[in-house]
């Protein structure tokens, strides 16, 4: 792949089909795992669709490399799915999008982002923006435009009690989204098309939640926890959390 406009001279951009060695490196050495809260690694459905990305859809996975050292510095994971372009047909979240893609192979008409990850040593260099640009390039090359993005708002954990509908409407002084990650997408031309209050589901025993959050959950109820974008509900020893996202659309 050609590096997007605005890339530093040292940046190389590849698909996982072009550099399967780096895809395996990221998986085997868990290069990006520390970027996510532990609870986020245990979605009810995520393994089924994240597990389908390679090798079946290696040409849709983006890898950013520091060519001076051949170091993998960022990754963009995407999935192809059927979408007719209407809001009625828009999946209600990332889980639904991923499961639709897995359950309806060969019917894809659009590309959905799943995750954009940047090595902590390379953050602050606008690489997340370049990952999104590269996702758009992949979508065009595969004939899968537009690019959908179920955006996980990066500051939502600061406001876990604010409904995602309200949070998504907040703007900064320049009229762009208040949330930094949403703002990255907006500055690249994306627009908000919907919110997904129950985008990703995580249900697990209280003991797991206690290990993930370093908290104690003495009884039933709703709990705010570190890194959570919304409260988690504990009932009869099982904690259920629905992570909210914001659907943003890159028309390309």
Predicted regions and their residues:
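Short amphipathic alpha-helix that is part of the acyltransferase structural core
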Residues: 1-89
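Short hydrophobic/aromatic beta-strand or adjacent loop that forms the aromatic wall/cage
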Residues: 59, 242-247
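Conserved acetyl-CoA-binding loop-helix of GNAT-fold acetyltransferases
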Residues: 123-141, 146-149
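Short, conserved beta-strand edge motifs with alternating hydrophobic and charged residues
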Residues: 148-151, 193-195
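ATP phosphate-binding glycine-rich loop and adjacent ATP-lid/helix-beta elements
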Residues: 182
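Conserved acetyl-CoA-binding loop of GNAT-fold acetyltransferases
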Residues: 186-194
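Short beta-strand-to-coil "C-cap" segments at the C-terminal boundary of structured domains/repeats
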Residues: 249-252
